[in-house]
């Protein structure tokens, strides 16, 4: 059996297992036991961010990452299909000092108008990956914001806004606790981390696995789907 077939079988097993009463009765251990009994790797990593994130999916991304760029629009479309009981957040992976400016700029633009974030993403990806501007230089994101119509005065004011600094610190804590070292990563319900590499770069399986783990969280946490 090839590695890709093994991955596909594992994801299918997780999806089917989540709907199984026996697996539901075992709780979180059921997923791990199922993987262990099959002598296969688990296409997710367990983390413990705490109950505050039990209804949240976070995408950790960075603008120098070509896979983040390739998946960005698809990820946002997928997020729009999630049950209303699940909250989706996208945030730069502030895993060290070089990424602080990126995170600060992202949250500043979100504070000004969250509706323009997709355009800010697109411009930032372009500047960093096509124009070779530095991903760690604050001027890169100031230019991205200006190019999408954000007034420089508004941008600078948002950058200095204390709650923005707090969001950056929260971002750093989340990425640290989740052990993020690859992007894009999905942190699902504060319990699981997956990447496209978890499923051998198969984007379809990536989102299927994310849906399966999100469904498991809804069941485990008794989150009510409010979608009409």
Q: Whereabouts are the PLM-identified features?
A:
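Bacterial N-terminal signal peptides that target proteins for export
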Residues: 1-10
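Extracytoplasmic thiol/disulfide redox context detector
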Residues: 9-100, 172, 176-179, 214-228
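Solvent-exposed, acidic/flexible segments
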Residues: 54, 64-71, 95-102, 114-117, ...
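Second-shell loop/turn segments in exported
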Residues: 61-64, 91-95, 107, 111, ...
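Sec-exported extracytoplasmic/periplasmic mature domains
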Residues: 70, 76, 80-84, 107-114, ...
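Extracytoplasmic/secreted envelope proteins and their assembly/folding machinery
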Residues: 72-79, 102-106, 117, 121, ...
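Structural microenvironment flanking redox-active thiols in thiol-disulfide oxidoreductases
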Residues: 83-107, 117, 121-146
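C-terminal cap of thioredoxin/glutaredoxin-like
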Residues: 147-228
């Amino acid at each position: 059996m090839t590695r890709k077939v093994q991955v596909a079988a594992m994801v299918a097993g997780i999806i089917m297992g989540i709907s199984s009463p026996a697996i539901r009765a075992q709780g979180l251990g059921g997923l791990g036991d199922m993987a262990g009994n099959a002598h296969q790797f688990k296409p997710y990593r367990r983390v413990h961010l705490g109950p505050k994130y039990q209804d949240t999916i976070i995408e950790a991304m960075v603008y120098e990452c070509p896979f983040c760029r390739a998946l960005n629009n698809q990820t946002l479309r997928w997020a729009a299909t999630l049950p209303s009981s699940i909250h989706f957040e996208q945030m730069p992976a502030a895993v060290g000092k070089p990424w602080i400016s990126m995170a600060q700029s992202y949250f500043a633009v979100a504070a000004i108008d969250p509706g323009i974030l997709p355009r800010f993403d697109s411009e930032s990806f372009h500047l960093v990956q096509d124009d070779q501007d530095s991903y760690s230089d604050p001027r890169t994101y100031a230019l991205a914001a200006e190019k999408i119509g954000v007034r420089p005065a508004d941008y600078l004011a948002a950058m200095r806004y204390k709650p923005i600094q707090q969001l950056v610190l929260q971002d750093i804590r989340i990425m640290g606790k989740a052990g993020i070292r690859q992007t894009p990563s999905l942190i699902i319900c504060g319990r699981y981390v997956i990447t496209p590499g978890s499923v051998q770069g198969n984007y379809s399986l990536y989102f299927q696995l994310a849906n399966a783990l999100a469904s498991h969280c809804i069941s485990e946490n008794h989150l009510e789907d409010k979608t009409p």
